[in-house]
Amino acid sequence: MMDQARSAFSNLFGGEPLSYTRFSLARQVDGDNSHVEMKLAVDEEENADNNTKANVTKPKRCGGSICYGTIAVIIFFLIGFMIGYLGYCKGVEPKTECERLAGTESPVREEPEEDFPAAPRLYWDDLKKKLSEKLDTTDFTSTIKLLNENSYVPREAGSQKDENLALYVENQFREFKLSKVWRDQHFVKIQVKDSAQNSVIIVDKNGRLVYLVENPGGYVAYSKAATVTGKLVHANFGTKKDFEDLDTPVNGSIVIVRAGKITFAEKVANAESLNAIGVLIYMDQTKFPIVNAELSFFGHAHLGTGDPYTPGFPSFNHTQFPPSRSSGLPNIPVQTISRAAAEKLFGNMEGDCPSDWKTDSTCRMVTSESKNVKLTVSNVLKEIKILNIFGVIKGFVEPDHYVVVGAQRDAWGPGAAKSGVGTALLLKLAEMFSDMVLKDGFQPSRSIIFASWSAGDFGSVGATEWLEGYLSSLHLKAFTYINLDKAVLGTSNFKVSASPLLYTLIEKTMQNVKHPVTGQSLYQDSNWASKVEKLTLDNAAFPFLAYSGIPAVSFCFCEDTDYPYLGTTMDTYKELTERIPELNKVARAAAEVAGQFMIKLTHDVELNLDYERYNSQLLSFVRDLNQYRADIKEMGLSLQWLYSARGDFFRATSRLTTDFGNAEKTDRFVMKKLNDRVMRVEYHFLSPYVSPKESPFRHVFWGSGSHTLSALLENLKLRKQNNSAFNETLFRNQLALATWTIQGAANALSGDVWDIDNEF
């Protein structure tokens, strides 16, 4: 064919030997077959087999313009012809004439990839059904009972039995084939009873012994070790209002208060702020209907969380931090006493307790003139090693983003309700979710971390130390904490405490889960969000929210009254099953609530955190502040900039909602950027203007300290109620820093710096 083409070309020009162009489409070594190479051959063929030159007669020259035009047309024709011809050769079998003429080697034949069928994607309804099926076949009570056996009871933090249970949890995580299992150890200081007994004694005015009231079996950790003597004054629950309502001053006196309503630490702090010299805490029969009047109980008095001797930094060994002490430690002795001991004290006191206290008829207000009470506390510090145990199911798309599910493991006493139920739920959820991933095709986009904490009884020490140790690693990675502690304390009510970011998720979950006894939906009140209580200091979810800025949720099935045996030696499996006969059903419902949280948070492309909920929180704060607009104006201040910051936050949430609506849900890069903006919201409500060491709970809504919005309002109220106590300089700082914190949250939600509304 090439010879024929050459012959035609030569004849056209009268046989004159001219240059011609060869196009080689040979496949290159690097696999690029689109390269075109041009070569010029003059006077002779590349394959001149006969080695003869063509003898031609020199023709007459044609007109220049006609010749050049004709040449151009023919060249283009030949180019098209050769490209088409060689293109056709690619479609024939290897080693054909076409391939040899093109001068190419046969391409390496690639083995076809085996076509495995893709696992079908599981949707929300599928996953909800699979979770329900697994819950139906799970026996929670046997695990709770196992954790209450002698080998694990009692399991005070740092004890051998606490470690035994830690190793059991670790082995279980490994048996469940989680993606990874590891442990985290800390060296912390706790307070324990000394060999010298604590005591409560009645003495006369000269300090002589009248009689011993009690050598209590329980104690209050982190009490000051001291002996004090003074009159005894009853202050109901020890709230601020209770102290305000008292007719008798408490300065220089020992205060006796009822357990409940607020934490031990808050009771002690309130008493100490009014110069009380000691505190006694008892459980009255009205609120805690326990038959055994001699029952002792345990608690702690640290107004904070974590190791109080390493405030704001982790308790790792050999960290060489200078000696430090939390400002939340009390400077007065504190002791729990039995109801029987309290009644003995009331026998030496005068004045009936107010009827609106709704307490025991034996209650009295103050000791008689001739008698005092002597309190001796001899607790000592002890350094212990604690273990936190972790297991993770890694996400398939965003493994670096994770929800943390945790439960306290230790307990003073048997701890069936306090830590046994939570640990059992943790183990069963880890087993079920691992099974769903390994066998049922569940592919969570984000990771799930299961955490078993130690030293929870001493103020969420294990959880807080982990947060302090890994705060920078957790930032914008851990996006929710689900607390399983004390999830089953009754059957009558379902109560929840959480960050507003989780309210929408909670509402949807309540609509999906049925009450374990009545069979009705947990969602019974459309106004439920207004009744949500703040997370308290004794809740392990609190440091996640207030210290780390991680949205957190804690929930329970419970009664209107407190569970009476928490922190006592009667917190046993036997008492738990007697009070809650349908324990397995209630535990199943608690696991279903937590399980649905976990699925929605790790499965959906859009993060299930409702950032718009904070608009109503900010609006509520501004409304409260507006009541004092005249006072603010008198100080020469304006709320204009606060309004502007609040408006910027509202606009930022609206823009983000629009961005989510316009985003292509299958574009993971875009969705991740949007989700990252959502994850910043809670964190940026941590005040950047206070030290984590001095004020660890920096959240302006849910933390504690002068930087909080509630503290700002409390200070401002004093301008009318008690002007001498009002601190105007403090208020000016509070208002300015609160405004900038809100503005910072709005800026973070806006995204990139060029998207921020800079009119502020």
Curated annotation (Swiss-Prot):
Side Cytoplasmic, residues: 1-65
Q: Which residues carry this modification: Phosphotyrosine?
A: 20
Q: What residues show lipidation of type S-palmitoyl cysteine?
A: 62, 67
Q: Which InterPro entries match?
A: PA_dom_sf, PA_domain, Peptidase_M28, Peptidase_M28B, TFR-like_dimer_dom, TFR-like_dimer_dom_sf, TfR1/2_PA
Q: Spell out which residues are annotated as carrying Phosphothreonine.
A: 21
Modification after translation, per record: Stearoylated by ZDHHC6 which inhibits TFRC-mediated activation of the JNK pathway and promotes mitochondrial fragmentation. Stearoylation does not affect iron uptake.
The residues on the Extracellular side of the membrane are 87-760
Q: Which residues are glycosylated?
A: 251, 317, 722, 727
UniProt topology in membrane: Single-pass type II membrane protein
Motif Cell attachment site, chain ranges: 646-648
Q: Which residues carry this modification: Phosphoserine?
A: 10, 19, 24
> Which parts of the sequence are annotated with region: Mediates interaction with SH3BP4?
1-67
- Residues annotated as transmembrane: 66-86
- What are the recorded Gene Ontology BP terms? intracellular iron ion homeostasis; positive regulation of B cell proliferation; positive regulation of isotype switching; positive regulation of T cell proliferation; receptor internalization; transferrin transport
Q: Which UniProt keywords apply?
A: Cell membrane, Disulfide bond, Endocytosis, Glycoprotein, Lipoprotein, Membrane, Palmitate, Phosphoprotein, Receptor, Signal-anchor, Transmembrane, Transmembrane helix
Gene Ontology MF terms:
transferrin receptor activity
- GO annotation, cellular component aspect: external side of plasma membrane; melanosome
Spans annotated as Ligand-binding: 569-760
Q: Coordinates of motif Stop-transfer sequence in the sequence?
A: 58-61
* Family label: Belongs to the peptidase M28 family. M28B subfamily.
Q: Identify this protein by name.
A: Transferrin receptor protein 1
Q: Which gene encodes it?
A: TFRC
